[in-house]
């Protein structure tokens, strides 16, 4: 039976199918922040692919804890990059399908913000949650304040396995899930720049 997440988790919660998070893990931090701000609005409303979700630079700055002058550029760049993103899957009949996250982006210079138009396929993914589509949830404000490149990914993994009391991950899986560059094959770099930095920030800023 599907869960009515609009009732249980309002727009200040981040609720995503686990497979959706796997698709967006290669995005930049600013793209992920924009996605995190926009998706709860898509989940809790009845918008279609013809309806925009507006994210202002002032809201982006406030929720992410960054300066407004930085937010203008970060939001526009993230909007542009998110528009180029797509993900793929293989249908039951063997067809290989590619889907864009967004069908249109309008940067409203006079209003200092971006209008995002999600595709119908993505809107369905953002609203469909049941036993066949497991999901992970956490407060939006927690992850938006994380500033290290991989802290958000680590936090999602921790929340995904929270009911188990912890989790183990191999180095190969860590590289795949975080899409780490080859430079982190050196264990010292991996520990200092990814694991230690992300753990320190998430432990300090999250539940």
Which residues does each predicted region cover?
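Charged, alpha-helix-forming regions
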Residues: 1-207
């Amino acid at each position: 039976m599907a869960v009515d997440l609009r009732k249980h988790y309002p727009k200040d919660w981040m609720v995503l199918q686990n497979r959706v998070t796997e698709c967006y893990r290669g995005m930049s931090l600013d793209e992920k922040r924009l996605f995190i701000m926009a998706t709860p609005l898509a989940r809790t409303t009845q918008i279609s692919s013809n309806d925009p979700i507006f994210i202002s630079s002032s809201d982006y700055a406030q929720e992410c804890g960054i300066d407004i002058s930085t937010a203008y550029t970060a939001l526009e760049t993230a909007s542009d990059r998110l528009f180029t993103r797509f993900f793929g899957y293989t249908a039951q009949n063997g067809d290989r399908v590619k889907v864009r996250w967004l069908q249109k982006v309008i940067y409203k210079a006079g209003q200092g913000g971006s209008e995002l138009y999600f595709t119908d396929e993505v809107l369905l993914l953002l609203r469909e949650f049941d036993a066949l589509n497991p999901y992970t949830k956490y407060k939006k404000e927690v992850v938006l304040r994380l500033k290290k490149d991989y802290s958000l990914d680590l936090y999602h993994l921790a929340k995904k396995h929270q009911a188990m009391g912890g989790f183990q991950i191999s180095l190969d899986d860590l590289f795949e899930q975080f899409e780490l560059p080859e430079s982190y094959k050196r264990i010292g770099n991996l520990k200092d720049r990814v694991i230690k930095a992300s753990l320190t920030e998430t432990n300090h800023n999250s539940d």
